[in-house]
Every structure is written in structure tokens, then in C-alpha cells.
């Protein structure tokens, strides 16, 4: 399962801004479709006030180009779009041109995971002007978000100084595809694992997880919950401390850790999910 398998492959052609198609129609009418062009993708400032960015998303560009076609359903939808001044947004002859059109592009990109800097090309797209224009939004959609996530993850990984970092961002990600993109970019940038099982399946990323506050709340006491989890998952026992009180949670985790050691097992880790770590 890859970039386009979640929907039908041709859906990527409509994953674009309307103005890419209106400009393409204008190029077609003006006889500029075969004019050779070069588009460069770059950014002006490093994100997060940092000194670098980490390039990501480029590995999915070849698949994007291969599947960037307009099928009958796409053409029918475009034909149904009205122009604000009346009539149809797109001319039938132009839509017929799109129906049989395939991109003919040469694309150069920095490798994923490379450090990049402002005002230098991350991706260079060369080919007929209309093709460069048609793919612009979809390509930037792949690269911009994943580069942002990879950069942030890289900063976290560096701050961790060799300790493993796991992506737990699915529940706050920008939808299902956003969750996949975050897991992919985080792994490329140095995260050791993800909580996202679908990303683990698709991209062969190691998966990792603990338990939630709801687990603790399901038992009479926090200590009961910790003991039950240690019994259920002795080889993957990470205890969440902050359901009620972090300091008491630490004491209960120590109790369970000693009990596990006596039984020949070992507490893997503890986790704090909220609050100000500096104050703790």
C-alpha cells in the first residue's frame, strides 16, 4: 500500500488548486503547452527559528508523476464546474486534451533526510510548461508538510541525545493521510518508531505503544491498573504516571517495577503525558 492506494490512483490529478487548471487551459489556448520551463521548489526561512530544514516527501514524487492522469470521472467533474460569469469553467476541447495527457517531466530532488537551507532548490521540475504547472500543487503538498514534520522531528531527536523518540501524533494529525505523512517523515528524520499501526504496515516502521488514562481509570486504583498491565504486557510494560498525580504514579510504578524484577521481568519505561516537565 503506497501513496495512492488509499483511493483510486487517478485521484492525485485533482489533488490540486483550481487555478492550476485554469492556467493550464490558458497555456493551451495560447499555444504555450510545449514551451520548456523550469520550476524550483524552495523555502525562504528555516522553520521554528532554526538553522536548517530536513528534506522529506521527495520519495513519493515518482509515483505522483506516474499516476497523474485524468480519467472520465475527473473530466466529467471538471466539465460540471461553472464559470462565475456563466457557462462552463473549462472548454470541451481542453478537457479532451487533458483526457489523453500524460506528464513528460525531468525531476531532480535532494535525497530525503538531507539537510537543506533557505533559498536553495529542494526540487527542480523541468519539462513542458503545462506539465510543470499541473503538478505544482500536488508536488508541494507532498514536500512542504513532510519537510516541516521532518525538521521538527530532527530537532527533537537531537535534543534527546541518543534516547529513542517515537511518533505518537496520530490523534492530533491533520486527518488519516496527515497521520501517515507525519509517521513517515518522523521516521526518515530519526524517530525510532510510531504508534500508527497503518504507517507501520505501509512503510515498515517499527511500532510502539503504552496504555492510556482510560486503562488506569478502568481499575479501582492506579496500582491495580499498573499491576494488571504488567501482567498483561510484561515484555512491553510502559506505565503512564499522570492520570491522577505524577508523584504518586512514580511511587506506584516503582512498586510494580520491583514486583516485576522479582518475577524475572523488567519495567521498560514510564511515561508522563501532560503538565510542565520542568516543574516536575
Task: Describe the role of every protein-language-model region.
Residues 214-280:
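Glycine-rich phosphate/ribose-binding loops and adjacent secondary-structure elements
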Residues 1-235, 266:
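Ordered alpha/beta subdomains of enzyme catalytic regions
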Amino acid at each position: 500500500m503506497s501513496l495512492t492506494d488509499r483511493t483510486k490512483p487517478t485521484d492525485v490529478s485533482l489533488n490540486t488548486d483550481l487555478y492550476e487548471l485554469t492556467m493550464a487551459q490558458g497555456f493551451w489556448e495560447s499555444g504555450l503547452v510545449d514551451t520548456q520551463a523550469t520550476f524550483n521548489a524552495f523555502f525562504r526561512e528555516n522553520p521554528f527559528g532554526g538553522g536548517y530544514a530536513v528534506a522529506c516527501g521527495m520519495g513519493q514524487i515518482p509515483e505522483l508523476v506516474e499516476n497523474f492522469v485524468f480519467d472520465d470521472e475527473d473530466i466529467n467533474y471538471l466539465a460540471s464546474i461553472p464559470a462565475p460569469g456563466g457557462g462552463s469553467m473549462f472548454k470541451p476541447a481542453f478537457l479532451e486534451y487533458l483526457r489523453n495527457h500524460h506528464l513528460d517531466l525531468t525531476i531532480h530532488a535532494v535525497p530525503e533526510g538531507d539537510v537543506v537551507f533557505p533559498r536553495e532548490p529542494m526540487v527542480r521540475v523541468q519539462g513542458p510548461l503545462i506539465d510543470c504547472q499541473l503538478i505544482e500543487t500536488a508536488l508541494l503538498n507532498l514536500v512542504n508538510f513532510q519537510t516541516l514534520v521532518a525538521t521538527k522531528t530532527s530537532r527533537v531527536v537531537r535534543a534527546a541525545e541518543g534516547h529513542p523518540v517515537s511518533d505518537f501524533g496520530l490523534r492530533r494529525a491533520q486527518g488519516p493521510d496527515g497521520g501517515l505523512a507525519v509517521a513517515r517523515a518522523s521516521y526518515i528524520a530519526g524517530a525510532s518508531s510510531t504508534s500508527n499501526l497503518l504507517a507501520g504496515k505501509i512503510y515498515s516502521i517499527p511500532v510502539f505503544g503504552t496504555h492510556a488514562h482510560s486503562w488506569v481509570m478502568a481499575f479501582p486504583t492506579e496500582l491495580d491498573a499498573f499491576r494488571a498491565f504488567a501482567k498483561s504486557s510484561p515484555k512491553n510494560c510502559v506505565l503512564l504516571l499522570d492520570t491522577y498525580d505524577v508523584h504518586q504514579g512514580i511511587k506506584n510504578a516503582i512498586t510494580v517495577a520491583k514486583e516485576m524484577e522479582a518475577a524475572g521481568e523488567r519495567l521498560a519505561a514510564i511515561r508522563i503525558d501532560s503538565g510542565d516537565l520542568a516543574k516536575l
